[in-house]
Design a protein with these regions (language model features):
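Contiguous, function-dense segments enriched for cysteine-driven chemistry
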Residues: 28, 43, 59
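Helix-turn-helix DNA-binding elements, focusing on the entry/boundary residues of the two helices
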Residues: 23, 34, 45, 60-63
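Short alpha-helical DNA-recognition segment
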Residues: 31-50
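N-terminal flexible/basic segments that precede or flank functional cores
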Residues: 1-25, 29-30, 35, 68, ...
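Short, basic-rich loop-to-helix N-cap that marks the start of a DNA-contacting helix
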Residues: 55-65, 74
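The DNA-recognition helices of helix-turn-helix-type DNA-binding domains
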Residues: 44, 55, 81
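Short C-terminal boundary/hinge segments that cap the last helix of small helical domains
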Residues: 71-81
Length: 81
């Protein structure tokens, strides 16, 4: 599966950074490494790192995968954003 797609979800650089911090927070709370999270959702470790640093946009599909990996609904996933 490719990490990249044309259907990017987040528009502003500031929002990308906030989203990335949320992903990192949830990953650490779940006691997962970037590699473990990447394997769990079928993406590369590099992609997870770039998302967490706010350097890479993502798609709705990947956001669903992330929320499922953290065992959260989308509402819970975005709760503190």
């Amino acid at each position: 599966m490719s990490d990249y797609c044309d259907n990017e979800f987040i528009e502003s650089q500031e929002d990308l950074k906030i989203f990335g911090l949320r992903v990192r927070e949830l990953r650490k709370k779940s006691k997962l490494t970037q590699s473990e999270l990447a394997e769990k959702i079928g993406l590369s470790t590099n992609f997870i790192g770039m998302v967490e640093r706010g350097e890479r946009n993502t798609s709705v599909d990947k956001i669903f995968k992330l929320s499922r990996a953290f065992k959260l609904s989308l509402a819970e996933f975005f709760k503190t954003l």
